[in-house]
Each structure stands twice: as structure tokens, then as C-alpha cells.
């Protein structure tokens, strides 16, 4: 064990440096996220309660079985952009109502794997003793291997294990703000390469053969997106690479790109940028895929976990 250095007069102790760094981090997070809960209007009783200073809010007072009026829809969209992920509890909605809620925020994607019978726009995520969680439990943004990745995803819990199976979310705008200026300068204007490859496992599980795999890989060749994405609503910058789908940086060799990517990937793992959601049946998470990453813990195996996700089409990252 390395001996602890004695405190020298006239020099600041390391703990003071850590404290200063943490205070600076908190200021960066606070500059990105507004901390107060928000009442929708005096007639509705709907309000948002932040989960952490960095990301996440729980919305109470809304019944998602009902169509949202224009004011309420705009308010929900505002909470999504502000908090990056919003949560709803005890929403007893059917698959059709799930889709109707999601369609209020845009056109829906049809995911290439595991659609729900009769509802091709719903992705089924079902794990139990016979279907262990996939090895894609890695920090990521959804479908960045598409030219126009998702705007957002709306995930509902249908069956949950007694304990475990939480999902973590990270604010990638705060992560960008926390970067050293030298790294910001290094990645400014750079594009990263994103690849469909990790989805092969899901396709194989769903029964795809070699010919079908080849068709998917032809349909989804590698794409490039800016490493620093500008949010189309707020204009804020965020880190837009992820450890699951990003495989390189345009114009760099692997040896040059990987150390930089590893630094950027690691920002999502900082607890100061995160919140953690404990699922209950009929809970919903709605996240902004343009500014947040997520990580589904696989600690519940062999117990059952059944989730369904609607995904909203996005635009081309800039």
C-alpha cells in the first residue's frame, strides 16, 4: 500500500482538490438541468419531480390511457427535453394505448427484431430461465446504426423480477460539459462510425438464418454521426458515441481512435451524471435518445422480465 503523503504547509491537500472538482461538476450539472418540480396547470394536478440533479423526473397525475390535449403534450415534451428521461408509475395501458401515446410524439419505428404479435411497432424484450439477457447490456443510445436514430423510446414493464432488472440512464449533455477543453477541441467536427453488428445476436435468437442476416447487414451498412451532437430543440451539445454501436472515428486508425473513444464511453459511467430506475409492473420510462444513454442491468437472471418498447423516429444527427 502506498504511504499517505504528509500535508505540507502552503500546499493544498488532495481532498481539497477533490472537493473543488466535485463542486465544479455539480455546477456543470446544475447548468444543464433545472431542479424544480413543475406543475402543469391549476386544473390538472400533474407535476414532475426530479430523480437526481443530473437526469430523470417522475411524472405524476397523468393517465396515459387518455389522449393528451395540446397543452399537456407540449408540457410532457418539455419535461422530456429538460430531464432526458421521464417516468410514470401504475399506467394500466394496453398495447394499443401504448402505441397511441407514443404516436403523439412522432412516427414510430418498426424494429428489425422481436416484434410483438399483431403490433409490429412494439419491440418485445423478454428474458427468463430459458432466455438469458443478451450480451448487449452495455451503455448505449438506441439504434445509432441507423442514418436517423430514434428520437426517443417509451418502455413499459409488463412483468418484473422481485428484485433487480433496474435501468440506469446517463445525461450525455452533462457528460460533454464535464469534458476537458482539450478533448472538446479534439473531437469538434469529428464523425464516429456506428455499426449494426451487435444486433446479430437478437436476430439469431428470433430465428433468422444466414440469408436473412445478410439482408439486414446489407440494409444497415456502417453510418457516421458527429461525435458531438447538437440537440435539435435546445441547441445543447452532447457526447454522441456509445460503447455498444460505435466502432471507430472517421479518418483515424483503430489505434488512434480507441483510446479517445474509451474516454468518451467512460463518461456515461459516472454516477454524477446518472439516475437508476427500479421497475414495477406498469411503470413506464420515456427517454430522449438524442441526449441520454441507458444501461439495462442483467442481475435478475434466471427470473422473468418482460418489457415492451415503442420507439419514435428521429432525425439526422448534426
Predicted ranges, named:
Residues 8, 14-17, 21, 31:
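Short hydrophobic alpha-helical segments enriched in small aliphatic residues
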Residues 12, 18, 35, 42-44:
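N-terminal cationic leader/targeting segments used for protein routing and processing
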Residues 39-286, 290-318:
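Fe(II)/2-oxoglutarate oxygenase catalytic core
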